[in-house]
Amino acid sequence: MNRIFLILFSLLSFVGFSQNPPLKHVTWNAVYVATNATGGEIHFTATIDKKWHIYSQRPTDVGPIPTSFTVTPSADFELVGKVEEEQAHEEYVAAFEAKVFVFSNQAVFKQKIKLKNQKSFTIKTSLEFMTCNDVQCLPPATLEFQVLVPEGGAKK
């Protein structure tokens, strides 16, 4: 009898779990913005649910995975400097028993690029980030983007 109950409980748990969508508390987008006559920036924007946050790019030795970006090299452009982030705020995170830099509500990261031609092309990028609230952290996630640079992608 106990065995039947255990099997039934396991099956019902699996069915119930499989119907719930995965937790998703951050929505990202990546776009190219022309800023000058020779190039522009890739803007990575995160929209973050209330009571959730993501971490700054600043590495820490206390636990959270910092947000990181990868841009696949191409003959069409060159990176100028590193990815810059808008102001993160410092917050005590009980899960790590430390103060860390986080973003709440929205985060914007920018990577400057110099165009090597004026044709249309796509920039392949990826980012890794970790989402947490006051109770739990979700496993780190990696997203990939194809960012379109239109023909004549520099600002006139």
Spans of model-derived segments:
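Sec-dependent N-terminal signal peptides
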Residues: 4-14
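Extracellular/lumen-exposed scaffold segments
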Residues: 19-156
